[in-house]
Amino acid sequence: MGAFLDKPKMEKHNAQGQGNGLRYGLSSMQGWRVEMEDAHTAVIGLPSGLETWSFFAVYDGHAGSQVAKYCCEHLLDHITNNQDFKGSAGAPSVENVKNGIRTGFLEIDEHMRVMSEKKHGADRSGSTAVGVLISPQHTYFINCGDSRGLLCRNRKVHFFTQDHKPSNPLEKERIQNAGGSVMIQRVNGSLAVSRALGDFDYKCVHGKGPTEQLVSPEPEVHDIERSEEDDQFIILACDGIWDVMGNEELCDFVRSRLEVTDDLEKVCNEVVDTCLYKGSRDNMSVILICFPNAPKVSAEAVKKEAELDKYLENRVEEIIKKQGEGVPDLVHVMRTLASENIPSLPPGGELASKRNVIEAVYNRLNPYKNDDTDSASTDDMW
């Protein structure tokens, strides 16, 4: 927890799929962290009469990956199989769903605690969870921790989840009522989130219920009625993404990428790469879920993208030639470009989103460069 590599691991895990009128893509990268502690779930078509429902979630583990991995495999079952979710006969009501989600979180947390104790060595890992449960009529946003989800509707951020931070007044009050404190914006000066699954060292205050502990496993659940005409896409991501991109920035960037490609894996990869180049030092995971009215590929946008790439290619050549003797390093090239007013850069991503294009041209013109120097310089680009 908190340890970093000498250079980032940039290999990605990808997946994509479609069904129920939805398309999704996902990407995850270990980045600078010593371990990959993120996990994710993507299920289109749920069992037990919920074939028209879908579930997606991102889990950001800390102090180990055990809780995140267990949740990605079992949280959905705990949600849909409890009696609060099922309710009476027929499709579950909105309140059934919201109550069932909450019950599912509390049940899986208690189940993991009992399992950990039986192994005679309490697991100290924990995980945030952000997800969406999508029915034909509603989208249920689920959040526990500081990962975040947002809905882009009619080209704007319509909704986003609130991060559960110890400095939040309501969270701080609960922490203090449980005998804890908030120091340097952390629970007891240590944990940066005030709600999470796992983290059982923070859930052992006698006389307090599970939602009254220093760290609570209770999710916030918001139901949003779907709008076939206006709903465009949903983004779920861990804080490795949000640390360097704001809600509107990421919404604008994703929308611009959807206008030049319909490959959702590629869009997610561009998000992850861009955040790495913007300075994210954490694991990074993102899921993009597109509704039928998501932005479509535009011939005009594709043309502008090609023109931008050609412009950058020419500028890299000019910068290298201007150097004269010897070839400037990639950091110098990036800093030079960053000082210029380059037209038509992707909104939200800006020059960082074009790092791969620039580096490809640089490598072609400088085939004898030292791969161990420039390729790892993502933390000092300009």
Curated annotation (Swiss-Prot):
Residue sites binding Mn(2+) 2 per the record: D60, D239, D282
Quaternary assembly: Monomer. Interacts with SMAD2; the interaction dephosphorylates SMAD2 in its C-terminal SXS motif resulting in disruption of the SMAD2/SMAD4 complex, SMAD2 nuclear export and termination of the TGF-beta-mediated signaling. Interacts with SMAD2; the interaction dephosphorylates SMAD2 in its C-terminal SXS motif resulting in disruption of the SMAD2/SMAD4 complex, SMAD2 nuclear export and termination of the TGF-beta-mediated signaling. Interacts with the phosphorylated form of IKBKB/IKKB.
Biological source species: Rattus norvegicus
Subcellular location: Nucleus; Cytoplasm, Cytosol; Membrane
Note accompanying the cofactor annotation: Binds 2 magnesium or manganese ions per subunit.
MF annotations from Gene Ontology: calmodulin-dependent protein phosphatase activity; magnesium ion binding; manganese ion binding; phosphoprotein phosphatase activity; protein serine/threonine phosphatase activity; R-SMAD binding; transmembrane transporter binding
GN (gene name): Ppm1a
Protein family: Belongs to the PP2C family.
One GO location term (cellular component): membrane
Protein's UniProt keywords contain Glycoprotein: no
Enzymatic reactions: O-phospho-L-seryl-[protein] + H2O = L-seryl-[protein] + phosphate; O-phospho-L-threonyl-[protein] + H2O = L-threonyl-[protein] + phosphate
Topology relative to the membrane: Lipid-anchor
All copies of domain PPM-type phosphatase, residue ranges: 23-291
Binding-site residues for Mn(2+) 1, renumbered to this chain: D60, G61
SUPFAM superfamilies for the chain: PP2C-like, Protein serine/threonine phosphatase 2C, C-terminal domain
GO annotation (BP), single: regulation of canonical NF-kappaB signal transduction
Protein name: Protein phosphatase 1A
Description of post-translational modifications: N-myristoylation is essential for the recognition of its substrates for dephosphorylation.
